[in-house]
Amino acid sequence: MSKPLRGRHQARKRAVDLLFEAEARGLSPAEVVDVRTGLADTNPEVAPLQPYTAAVARGVGDHAAHIDDLISSHLQGWTLDRLPAVDRAILRVAVWELLYADDVPEPVAVDEAVQLAKELSTDDSPGFVNGVLGQVMLVTPQIRAAARAVRGPRDT
């Protein structure tokens, strides 16, 4: 059972890498996914992206404005552009999971983000990420309910 969970952790970590790369290169997450997929298709030494990695990166790109607005509204004393780029990417992955990944329990999304912050960012980042996501979690049920209402029962 730990194998799939570890696989998801690696997929999230790779999604953070892709989002970081997209921002650094001025590309959309979908463009970076396409480039990486093309490299894997043409070069056997390049590992293909896991489907969950591509889904997360594309999902963050598709909902970037909403995700960034939600993160920004829960930052205290910070602006999104002042955060370290890796923290932005971690928060974006976690918020996408909180809002759009129905198969990921909210505490798992937060715990995974905190773990990624421990692995990839500064000593202060895990606590910061946990605090921001704790605040976001307070409003995600309402956001999900509103999205379901807009989509209607046949689209869920």
Swiss-Prot record:
Protein name: Transcription antitermination protein NusB
Keywords: RNA-binding, Transcription, Transcription antitermination, Transcription regulation
Gene3D superfamilies: NusB-like
Xref: Pfam families: NusB (PF01029)
GO cellular component: cytosol
Keyword field contains Cell inner membrane: no
Family: Belongs to the NusB family.
Gene Ontology BP terms: DNA-templated transcription termination; transcription antitermination
Entry keyword Metal-binding: no
Coiled coil: none
Function: Involved in transcription antitermination. Required for transcription of ribosomal RNA (rRNA) genes. Binds specifically to the boxA antiterminator sequence of the ribosomal RNA (rrn) operons.
Alphabetical list of SUPFAM superfamilies matching this protein: NusB-like
Example GO molecular function: RNA binding
InterPro entries in alphabetical order: NusB-like_sf (IPR035926), NusB_fam (IPR011605), NusB_RsmB_TIM44 (IPR006027)
